[in-house]
Amino acid sequence: MPVTGRRVVSMGVILGFVLSVICAPPPAAAAQGGVVHTSTPRIIIDTDLSLWWDDATAIGMANVLAQRGQLHILGIVSDIRNPHAVAAIDAIDTAYGHPNIPLGAVAHSEANTAPHGYTSDLIHKLPHSVHSSENVSGAVVLYRQLLAGQPDHSVTIVAIGAYTNLAGLLRSKADRHSSLDGRALIRAKVKRLVIEDGLFPGSAPALTNQKLDLVSAREVISGAGWPTPIAWVDGSTGLQTKVGGALCTTVRSTNPMRIVYESRFGCGPPGDGDWDGPTLLYAVGGSQQFFTELGQGGAAFLNAAGGLSWSTDPSRPHDVYVHVANQPALNERIDALLGAR
């Protein structure tokens, strides 16, 4: 049966058609209130939010920037096999006043093989209308629906997790949302793919995001690969991005960033860096003072160990990898966004 919007429609053909119109994801402007200007970054976040706290920070920061009209969240797709991850994402979005952001779940998320981490805390402490992956569209279906409705070359995909949904989008066929196959749809609608991964320019072993789905990683990175420019915000960006230390004393107990921080670190100093927050900031632009772009004329490739390396590649002239240029300023900016409501 058709899957549209944030709900799975499972009734008859006629009723299903009616509901597909009524329950379709709200237009981009309606989801966050207001007209989307052509200059406003339009993003789709692809996340493995479940255990690592920095996925939550990226989504929280995106919501704050959306409140300020500095970006527009078209949708968020989960790429982790935790059926309740989308409920936690919905809890974050709802806490920031954006309960209607379209959500999608990776195929077979009901397998429930991923640790739940702090997702249970968010679900138990904050209101939300999505309860599991059964309540939302499939990630690839939602990708296609969202991309089809956007102007050409206007969407930035912020990939801060596994490659499963990206590979699925590449493989996807024409459907009722678009007559284009996945590769052609990406080429038409996506401006750039921003990925948190790698340790460039040297060679690295397989890191978390590759290990989650190495087959899909190869599909996105190798061979014909991804048909738009890719910016890689590599692992070095997060090592010294120690943020969130003041949340327990500066924001209310219902602040979703505080809930995540307390769950992971118990109000002590951050026990981990933050990789996904910098990736989100870089992806939406206007933060050149924090980052430097390197590696022009090259591209990432998967080495024999399943990790990423950088090499000259004339076929991908617009790919870059990104390092931090001003760590204190970056940390200050992220802390300010984490503490905002």
Feature annotation, model-predicted:
Residues 1-31:
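Secretory targeting and sorting signals
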